[in-house]
Amino acid sequence: MANVRRHMQVDHRANLETAALAVGESLALAWAHFHLLRGLDNGRLQHPAIVTRFDLLYDRLWRAAFDAFFAKVGTLLDNKKGSDSLLRFLVLARRYASLEVKNVLPEIEVELSNQDAPLAKLKRWRHEVVAHKPTAHDAVGFHTQNRMTLTEIESALEQLDDYFNQISWNMLGLHSEHRSAFAGIVCQAELLFATTALGLATEPE
């Protein structure tokens, strides 16, 4: 692959690097919002009394992190022309790649278009619950068909990250680590819950 990258036209590489930077930033922020959701959920499980005491605050924090996460997922999966999405990055890769590199792209394209895959569920959540909220939306039916745990969401995000790095490595020789950049949010959220619980426990009657 090194030979393929060496002979890429300068302007093509520049276009790919610009797209990779934009997609990478969205991936990192998606991970940041996911880690916040995970931290809030862990805090809820470890200290349920805190959620009972501050129920409205917890609900709003969760909703804000939820909406922010799916906004970034929407950016990553947007198929509109000119968007800074993983799909746009894939289009550029197909346009500029040699035949050898193009052989690794169809599998990614198939998975991204698979309507039964976890990624399709993420896309539907963003479209029907966070972004557009169609008037004919059936909340009960939608939640039954598209229910996802945080672990399933995490797996889908890992898949997006993996697809990005497959393209980036084959086209640019670059591998990026997005997940760990904001991983400390989980521990910090847990610590916040624990500290608050301790403070409540020592409150005078």
How would you label these PLM feature ranges?
Residues 112-140:
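Histidine-centered, metal-coordinating catalytic motifs and their short helical/loop contexts
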Residues 1-118, 143-205:
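Amphipathic alpha-helical interface segments
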